[in-house]
Amino acid sequence: MKYDYIIVGAGSAGAILATRLTEKPDTSVLLIEAGPDYPDIESLPDEVRIGLSTGADIITKDHNWQFWGNPSPKAAPMPVPRGRVIGGSSSINGQVFLRGMPEDYDMWNDMGNNEWSYQKVLPYFRKLETDLDYSGDFHGSDGPIIARRHKRENWIESQVAFYDACKDSGFPDGPDQNHPDVTGVGPTPFNNPNGIRWSTNLGYLTMSRHRLNLTIKANCITQKIIFDGTSACGLEVESQGEKFTVYGNQIILSAGAVASPQLLMLSGIGPADQLTSLGINVVKDNPGVGANLRDHPIMSALWAVKEGHIQDPEAPRTQVSARYTAAGSEIRNDMKLSFNSFAIADSRVEDRLSESTQSHHADINTPIGVKISVSLQLAESVGHLRLVSSDVNEQPELNFNYYSTEFDLERGREGMRKAINLGESKHFSN
């Protein structure tokens, strides 16, 4: 069979694409996922289903690619969580449902991609969500992804202290962090109603997986793109030790910021010198593949809590956050502060870790404490992804080059000073 579309990766984007494309009954779609499939909420394991603070969701071996990356040339390697499960990273993430600023999308428009202006993407933000707290021009009321905020009366003591400390230091009140004009401190929007991580699996595939024109294949590793000349026409896929070939009119890579460029390069699209050095036949010399690797670097200031102060490890770890513009920056809300409680609940978390992960988390029984995280939302620094082998099972080298520009360093230092000052506030005296 030749499909109309083959989508690689059933994650945050792939599951949505498959659902939307199969709205037309005469359009056939094959959705391929490397990890396991959980067809309903009852079959989800706890670390995927529970979205409050399982502690294991982003570091366990069962649903994570277990990538490691280099933050900077001098820093120790860090885990790079990427979902290997139906729903992709939306099935293991922290569920922060925070939009970019309008200027972010308008910048893409100004670069020539006029379908990505804020005014053009806003209808789709509204279409995808059911916001339980806000309505009006900027929010949806009947979309597949459920968004909510923790009510003030349900904030834990330390989250209230963070909010009050921010207000005392001059942050304005920002109750709707997804409003286009917002800045300041307020409740963080999450896609976890009743503590359930509402992934694209639950939100989108639940309403489409019954369709006869949608085929979902889990536990399948895509090894290579097949080309007819320079046009993609199929894929080589491995499942349970057997190799298969599938064909489609259009091949869509939706495997994430690591696996998509990796697959392109393994298939012969990328920097020619890098590919030939690994014995990969060059289909298209494209030095941009693997370049311009970007992320939101986060630093944290940590405090131990007073003896006798009890924090529930099953309570929400984040409820409140603040968006602000760094001093001297022309990028509005380029910084974010989040208050987090942290705790490892019990030894069961350690039991679910791979040996590799345990070696990088030797002190797995982290003392209960709190931290204020400083996130650089639009960094200047860029990194790169580089193949180390022609074997799809060997992860590429990930070099992020965090804080490699003076402007990023200035904003990061200022953010850490703000975090430390907030943590020393009288509101945390208890």
What does each model-found stretch correspond to?
Residues 1-430:
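N-terminal redox-cofactor-binding region of secreted/periplasmic oxidoreductases
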